[in-house]
Amino acid sequence: MRALTAAVLFVAGLTPVLAQDSSPTGPTFPNTVANCNAWYTIVKGDGCDTVEKKFKITPEQFFKWNPDVSTDCVKNFWVGNSYCVGVGKVVSSSKTSTTVKSSSTTQKTSSTSSKLSSSSKPVNTTTTPYSTRNPVTSYNLTQPYTATSLPPAKTQSGQPAYCNQWHWVGTGDTCLTILNLYGSRLTQEQLIIQHSEATALARTSYSVPWTSSQGNATVPAPTDYTPPVKTIVANFTASPQMTGVPQSCQNFYQAQDGDTCDVILKQFDYISREQFFSWNPALQGNCNGLWVGYYYCVANFATGVIPMPPTVTKVPDGAPTAINTCNKWYQAVGNDDCDAITTYFGTFSKSDFIKWNPSVYQDCSGLKTDSWYCVGIPGTPTTRTKPLTTTSLGSLPTQTGISASCKQYWLVSPSDTCASIISNAGVSADDFYKWNPALGGSACKGLQPNYYVCVSLTAAPTDSGSTTTITGPPTKGSNPPTTTTSGGGGGTIQTPSPIMPGMIGGCVRFWFRGKDGASLFCADIAKDAGVSLPDFLKWNPGVGSNCESLWADTWYCVGVSGKPTTMSSGIPTPASK
């Protein structure tokens, strides 16, 4: 018998032997099949596919035997853990631990007809996990938190004390998923107003319907949300902007910190990269060359060729199902409303849109950003039945009460505050709140994203007695509106372009920071110009209090009195020279 065993081992040694073990040598997962009799411990470089190939098993077999591993092999596939690569007879026992004698198991190899025999020793199997990634310790399972009083203990601050219905925020929840769940009785504005920290949704807010055994709480009547009334800025011009932008540009985008052309093209996905660079030639094809605060052209189409909004023909997740014949869907963005969507497409009426999408309600108050809506059924035209009318740059929303003499505006972003606008625009707080009464003073409760606020007036006084007057858009070319300045020392001058955002009104002395001035920073510029550093920073607030945003190829104010001058090369000189 020993001779026969030796012969078998000798023959087996001549063939490739798979690196499998009869028992795991590393930690295992609890749901691995109980009748596993072949194990493999993962090493660096392994993947599910390489293991399947190595042991000549199918993916279905591997994932069936190792159900804790995700089918994309991303979750629970760990180096050092043991996984099942072969099974024997199914073990069936009601006991926690059983001893099973396995019969001789054979496995044929592709290169030889010899057989590999497994050990005939008893194999101890158990239905209880016996290995973990960390030492087993005793722990107590606590019952999940359940609210027993109003309000629940795990809530975020700032929520109404009279609330009597709550939602537990789970993994994957967003404001949109919550609104979709309670959309019949909750609007986006109500959610935001009632949850001052809703933008920081985390798994800390517990929310389930709760009924008091002592009777219903007295709930004040709800206060309807009234959005600010939109008015139109009739004399707005996108400024500052880089040279070469076509005067016929129909729509602009103001670059934010961190923007690249890829960010813009994703937002305005109806234009191509080539179109964007042709409308903004100063970029010279540099996708990362955007200047924060500058306006870039994102639409300059000939009449009648404005592209249709992007749509999909495959039913997206979360799409409405009220119309089972819908064959085209559109995802709402930004400031969309029913009128705007109807106008953009020009292939259906507003009543059609509401009928296809009843979740928006008759007054369109249920329309939600990022949600999908039906925009086509069989028979809907594929091209506009009437041309899309483009609006001038003046169609920009401002809040009520804004100063009628305002000439420079600031588009409020979601991250803006009154303090940040005052700092970046270089205006005084008193003037800012006086020009924008809808903000509610220093409390700044009325500041609304995607609305314009006033940051400069006509004839704004300066210490030198000079005044600034906007003369309107240029008659040719693409520069921003010119500024004619009357200096205290006599003479007039036009503000050059481009300038830093927020430059003081009434500047009469300008210096261009070109290649020959690239080594100069705020303190150097102020010293050469014969002005104090605090004055330079006050006149050019866009550079930042630490001169961290000093731009090349840009004009800077170096004087608000003296003879009007533009210094386009070299270093700045004092007004006395």
Curated annotation (Swiss-Prot):
- What's this chain's function? Might have a role in sequestration of chitin oligosaccharides (breakdown products of fungal cell walls that are released during invasion and act as triggers of host immunity) to dampen host defense.
Spell out the Polar residues composition-biased ranges.
Answer: 122-135
Quote the protein name from its UniProt record. Answer: Secreted LysM effector Lys4
Query: Origin organism of this chain?
Result: Pochonia chlamydosporia (strain 123)
Question: Domain remarks in the entry?
Answer: The LysM (lysin motif) domains are small globular domains involved in binding chitin in eukaryotes. Lys4 contains 5 LysM domains.
Question: Pfam families this protein is in?
Answer: LysM
Q: What induces it?
A: Expressed constitutively with no significant difference during colonization of banana roots.
Q: Which Gene3D superfamilies match?
A: LysM domain
What the entry lists under InterPro entries is as follows: LysM1-like, LysM_dom, LysM_dom_sf
Residue positions the entry lists as glycosylated: 124, 140, 216, 235
* Annotated keywords: Chitin-binding, Glycoprotein, Repeat, Signal, Virulence
Keyword Glycoprotein recorded: yes
Question: Which residue spans adopt a coiled-coil conformation according to this UniProt entry?
Answer: none
Indicate, by first and last residue, each region the UniProt record lists as having compositional bias (Low complexity).
96-121, 464-485
Indicate the segments forming the LysM domain, all copies.
38-85, 251-298, 328-375, 408-455, 510-558
Q: What is the lineage of its organism?
A: Eukaryota, Fungi, Dikarya, Ascomycota, Pezizomycotina
Q: What's a Gene Ontology MF term here?
A: chitin binding
Report further notes. In plants, chitin acts as a microbe-associated molecular pattern (MAMP) that is recognized by lysin motif (LysM)-containing plant cell surface-localized pattern recognition receptors (PRRs) that activate a plethora of downstream immune responses.
Task: Please give the family membership noted in the entry.
Answer: Belongs to the secreted LysM effector family.
Q: Region Disordered: which residues?
A: 96-135, 464-490
Region forming the signal peptide? 1-19
